[in-house]
Each structure stands twice: as structure tokens, then as C-alpha cells.
Amino acid sequence: MGKKICVVFPGIGYHTDKPLLYYSKKYMMAHGYEIVDVTYGKLSGQLPEEIQKVFDDGWNKALDCLKTVDFSDAEDIVFLSKSIGTAISARYAAEKGLKVRNIYFTPLEITMQYANSNGIAFHGTADPLVNTGELTRLCEAKNIPLYRYKGGNHSIETKDILWNIRTQEDIAEKYIDYLNF
């Protein structure tokens, strides 16, 4: 039986110690996945104005982080990704020809240029970086289920702490169901 690998592609200011990635990563660890954290250091450019610059810089840093990871004998590969990390992870899977299950937290529109249909996505409707209607259309075209959280920002949070906690639980239930183990 091959190994199980989970690669975590964070966002720029949303690191793996924040709720969406923290709990999903803990879940993967509890199920025997080897965790590989992609780190970018300081990325050049700002979202959304310089998205291509940020994406290209993050892409190059992710390639460097993953150059020693051997996916060839993996029985299952899961990519957890957030924001710009969703675009980087989708491109990595596409260009490396990997069979990956993707969990996209707050994907950007650029993500859908590379994404395949093997994924699930979560989005806050008050996300200032993404047009909800356009993301919905792009996800539908790729057959990627998109769960929308009314009023949630780019972290899928609001000022209401209890709403945030209940939303984290709902998101976790959905990705646990998607992973099906």
C-alpha cells in the first residue's frame, strides 16, 4: 500500500495556523497523511492588483518547496489550498499530471484556468477579491461544487464569532464528506 500525501498551499496572509487550513490539516494528519507545507516567504506584489505577479512568484516558490516530494508511489494525494494557493495547487496538479483531490478554500478566478473537476470549493459572498457570480459560473463549468457562505469575507468569516464557528463546522462536514474516509 502506498503512502498518503496532503500538500497544504496557504494564501499570502492566511497561513496554516488559521482555522480553514488548521482544522483541515489536523483532519488529514489524523487519517495518516504525510503533510507537506508549501511556504512562500515574502511574495512580490499585492492582490488583487498584481495577481499575475503574485501567482508567478508563488508558483516558483512552490516548485522549489515540492522538488523533493515523490508522488509516484502515493495511493492518495489531497491538496488543501487557500486563496492564491488554490491557483498554485491547481496548476501544480495539472502540469505534473497528478491525480489529486482538491479542497479549494476561497479560490480566485485564476484558479479555474487550471482546475479539474476533482475538487470542492468554499467561498464567502462578501469576498472583496472575487466576484461571486463569476466564480459560480467558472465552478459550474468545471463541475466543481461551490459552497457559498452569505456575508463571509475572504477568510469566510464575519464579525459574528458564533457564525464563524458554525460556518467552520459546516465547511468541515462538507470536506469530510467529500474525502469520504
Which ranges hold each PLM region?
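A conserved short beta-strand
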Residues: 96-109, 118
